[in-house]
Regions:
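Conserved ABC ATPase signature
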Residues: 150-154, 158
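Conserved beta-strand-loop-alpha-helix hinge in the C-terminal portion
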Residues: 194, 219-220, 227-256
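Conserved ABC ATPase "signature" region
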Residues: 129-146
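ABC ATPase nucleotide-binding domain signature region
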Residues: 44-122, 319-373
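The feature captures the beta-strand-to-loop junction immediately N-terminal to the Walker
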Residues: 36-38, 308-310
Length: 373
């Protein structure tokens, strides 16, 4: 069986990029692999070794990308991440409000079709065969209705398609995706899994998914490699991995810890407003596209709300108004804890009353330090 990627006793030359043990890994023709493990366990560092980012001491990785005629590893292995789709990977200039500060849409604002054409041109020569591939990708991804859309107005699910299509124009032999399902609703996750399944079946493409949760492993995955405590476990079939996987505990916290949380001292709130959030006839618009139109919404003290809807429906936009991340919120009739927006308060005066967690927040607060060996 053809070994596409083979690593034997891999140890990086630089100590700060080393795993706890030498890495042994093989990826063979017909295998689609999930790399699974907890955050901070070493998955990203393992992928860096797979793609040859860090030179090894003894044995360099062996690659056999045939039938591909391309020789460079970077041409045959494409690694895309989905930690955040606004701003490039490891972009230190990214900030939390970046998505909402892109207010000016003019003739210089890129549209999907132009950016995809740019990616197509950079990936190779313009030939009838490659144009046929481009057309096939557009049809497979159902992207026709997205081509004339501004890139900054794409939803999370649409951005995944955009980024994936851009990568496939280069016809890689191996496609590695880091957390492809993060931040997607259930329906969009299922659609993406079906799309990846089709790619795995119809193309000479090996797919490797980097996942934090074993529940995200799609049906088309054939093998699993677990990475934890900076160690790469032996590869096993998906069935073997699922059979030996530890059951999910019925309780995430012990009764003792739960009681300690219940017994935490009550903190009297500074504000006693009956209306925590109040919006009146709120309208959010980018260019000709209306995201929210004449929205009335009141959240009363003690209520618990769930915002549900498809990707692109406006959920994140609505939260950006509450948290004052969207500059358009200052032109809207919005009150938080009884204080109308735009009454002289700073963004931090607003945020100090709100607890907020999101992929974009982690992205903007990321550190860029290697693990110590």
């Amino acid at each position: 069986m053809q070994k596409i990627i083979s690593i034997k006793d891999g140890v990086t030359r630089m100590p700060e990029w080393r795993m706890a043990e030498p890495v042994n890994f093989e990826s063979c023709e017909g295998e689609h692999i999930a790399i699974v493990g907890p955050n901070g366990g070493g998955k990203s560092m393992f992928v860096d070794i797979i793609v040859g980012r860090h030179p090894l001491l003894m044995h360099d990785p062996d690659y056999d990308f045939s039938p591909s005629t391309k020789t460079l590893v970077s041409d045959n292995i494409k690694y895309i991440t989905f930690r955040d789709t606004y701003g490039g990977d490891n972009d230190r200039t990214y900030f939390l409000q970046q998505r909402w500060n892109q207010l000016e849409i003019d003739e210089n604002t890129p549209i999907v079709k132009d950016k995809l054409e740019e990616a197509y041109s950079m990936a190779g020569e313009d030939t009838p065969e490659r144009r046929a591939l481009q057309k096939h990708i557009y049809e497979l991804f159902h992207m026709e209705h997205l081509l004339d859309k501004y890139t900054i107005l794409l939803s999370s699910g649409e951005l995944r398609k955009f980024k994936l299509a851009s990568t496939l124009f280069s016809e890689p032999r191996v496609l590695i995706m880091d957390n492809p399902f993060i931040g997607l609703d259930a329906d969009t996750r299922d659609q993406l899994k079906e799309l990846l399944k089709t790619l795995a079946q119809e193309h000479a493409l090996q797919i490797i998914l980097v996942l934090s949760k074993s529940d995200d492993i799609p049906d088309f995955i054939t093998h699993v490699v677990e990475v934890k405590d900076m160690k790469v476990m032996p590869k096993m079939t998906k069935e073997e991995y699922l059979a030996q996987r530890a059951p999910i505990p019925s309780r995430m916290l012990s009764q003792e810890l739960e009681q300690q949380i219940i017994n935490l001292p009550y903190s009297d709130r500074e504000y006693k407003s009956q209306e925590v959030v109040k919006m009146n006839k709120v309208r959010i618009q980018y260019g000709k596209r209306i995201i929210l139109k004449d929205l009335d919404w009141t959240v009363n003290n003690g209520e618990r709300w769930a915002l549900s809807g498809q990707n692109g429906a406006g959920k994140s936009t609505l939260l950006s108004l509450v948290c004052a991340d969207n500059p358009q919120s200052y032109a809207c009739d919005i009150a938080l804890l009884g204080n109308p927006r735009g009454s002289g308060e700073s963004i931090w005066d607003i945020k100090k009353h709100i607890g907020y967690v999101s992929p974009e927040l982690h992205r903007s607060s990321a550190t860029f330090q290697p693990f110590a060996s």
